Amino acid sequence: DYIFSAIKRHRNVEGIIFPDRSQITMTVPFMKAYTELLVESCHKRGAHAIGGMSAFIPNRKDPEITEKAFENVKNDKLREATMGFDGSWVAHPDLVSICKDVFSEHLNGEANQISFVPGYDIEDSMLHNFEIENSSITMEGIHTNIKVGILYMHSWLNGQGAAALFNLMEDAATAEISRSQLWQWLHNSVETENGETINESFMEEAFETVFSDINDIENIEKAREEFKKLVFDEDFSDFLTLPAYHLIN
């Protein structure tokens, strides 16, 4: 949600262009600053600091994917526990024990670590430091945003607010990040890592390429057209769900 908010509010600010969604991790400067501020703010007031949701989900038909999900969640929760969080949440019941074990080991018998009040001294500028080293905008990132956006919109229009996409549990925030990034790249004529300018013809071709892979999904056309409209419209809709409500049967 914070990533989406950052992109939305800075989408037309000169000099601020966000890279591929996969490159905006919890360890980049502005995300690290906000999580540190969260822990400090909560503990100063005697409140629990709860970490974010790990979107990774296991695949019981694919042990390799499941093992990778377990490892990712473990690393994610270890980072949170080390920062000072008191607990966290996950996207799938099979991951509860992993999350619990990490926090139990780190807390060493304590119910929480509220007594730990870090002195991070977060300044406003740190929350707006969007510099990400060695970042780029790739064709893979563009195609992924389009595909995730269309598939999530399709899921949402069919009554599912959370969708399992590519072994991740995605909600509206992911679709909003995808949509707002595509909008920013298109309406600011940003260049990809290969020097290609993202204009309307470029984006049209990208949509066609992605749609050719998913056009056999039932009733996918409505989702495609709505998501595409949100990307191409000059006016930036505050939330993608607002115009989509009119499409619900």
What is the meaning of each model-derived region?
Residues D1-N249:
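Conserved alpha/beta-domain cores
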